[in-house]
């Protein structure tokens, strides 16, 4: 029989790997954005996005830009493809993090 604790830690590892993939895709999206739309790059604070002095309100702008699918009207196909990928990975990572939290609560109740 598989241990529930081992299953929980396996789920945590999968979640962490997907978070790393999401951040990597987001970083690649910002590189493409810098080349194809410098104004939007500045609008979302692309240069300081992953720094400690980054501006969270500008970072949230990019999240809402992708969440609302406003990128669909963009002229660059590569940028549209990257936004779609980041959006799918964000949804997957959010679902996995939710599952980890629910699993943790279940483990605390049952053990």
UniProtKB/Swiss-Prot annotation:
Keywords, ordered alphabetically: Cell inner membrane, Cell membrane, Membrane, Transmembrane, Transmembrane helix
Cell membrane as UniProt keyword: yes
Location (main, coarse): membrane
GO CC annotations, alphabetized: plasma membrane
Compartments where found: Cell inner membrane
NCBIfam families: PRK04960.1
Protein known as: Universal stress protein B
Lineage start: Bacteria, Pseudomonadati, Pseudomonadota, Gammaproteobacteria, Enterobacterales
């Amino acid at each position: 029989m598989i241990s529930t604790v081992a299953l929980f830690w396996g789920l945590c590892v999968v979640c962490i790997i997907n978070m790393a993939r999401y951040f990597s895709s987001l970083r690649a999206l910002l590189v493409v954005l810098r080349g194809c739309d410098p104004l939007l790059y500045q609008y979302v604070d692309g240069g300081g996005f992953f720094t400690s002095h980054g501006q969270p309100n500008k970072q949230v702008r990019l999240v809402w830009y992708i969440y609302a699918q406003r990128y669909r009207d963009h002229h660059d196909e590569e940028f549209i493809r990257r936004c779609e990928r980041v959006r799918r990975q964000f949804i997957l990572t959010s679902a996995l993090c939710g599952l980890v939290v629910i699993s943790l609560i279940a483990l605390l109740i049952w053990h």
